[in-house]
């Protein structure tokens, strides 16, 4: 075992993999605990490209990525073949499936900030580990919110976004009733301390 400092501060043991790769054409796509995304030739096993997230590791107690999702945008859309990947600093990135570069026009600089309208919390309280679902023209995202640490934890809201632009479309906030609501605007915050999907 590594010393406590290496375990808790340097994250030297964060090398386990929980990702299930997806197979699109002749390529496997997967992600690493440090939110790197890789495209691998399905025949030779050689790496085609790697996107390396630059988010700082410090302050995050649980580093894991469980997978990525694939989406084909309408013809004529920039970056038409997309890989959506969660990051441990609560972002959802859209990458060009052919090059690994961030998709322009999606969110801000190719990413959406999932901490929007969630209120203030330690970074480790809200992270994204699971791939989103792309269904009926919606990018649907749930998150892992740490449990049993505080009474005022981030919301367990499930949100849907436009998979081309990254614009929010609807939100299912357990504290607002059984039906989806319009995305929040301004300084409003989704109901804190609600159940989450551990995604």
Predicted regions and their residues:
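Short, ordered coil/turn segments that flank beta-strands lining enzyme active or ligand-binding pockets
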Residues: 43, 88-90, 97-98, 108, ...
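Solvent-exposed loop/turn segments at secondary-structure junctions
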Residues: 35-36, 56-57, 90-91, 113, ...
């Amino acid at each position: 075992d590594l010393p406590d400092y290496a375990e808790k501060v340097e994250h030297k043991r964060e090398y386990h993999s929980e990702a299930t790769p997806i197979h699109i054409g002749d390529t496997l796509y997967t992600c690493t605990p440090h939110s790197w995304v890789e495209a691998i030739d399905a025949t030779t096993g050689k790496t085609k490209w790697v996107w390396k997230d630059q988010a700082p590791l410090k302050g995050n107690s649980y580093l894991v990525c469980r997978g990525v999702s694939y989406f084909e945008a309408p013809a004529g859309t920039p970056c038409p073949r997309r890989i959506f990947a969660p990051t441990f600093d609560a972002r959802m990135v859209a990458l060009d499936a052919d090059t690994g570069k961030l998709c322009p026009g999606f969110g801000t600089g190719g990413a959406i900030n999932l901490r929007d309208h969630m209120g203030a919390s330690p970074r480790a309280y809200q992270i994204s580990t699971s791939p989103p679902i792309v269904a009926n023209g919606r990018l649907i995202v749930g998150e892992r919110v740490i449990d049993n640490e505080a009474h005022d934890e981030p919301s367990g809201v499930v949100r849907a976004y436009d998979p081309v632009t990254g614009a929010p479309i609807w939100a299912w906030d357990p504290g607002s009733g059984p039906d989806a609501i319009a995305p929040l605007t301004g300084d409003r915050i989704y109901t804190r301390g609600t159940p989450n999907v551990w995604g």
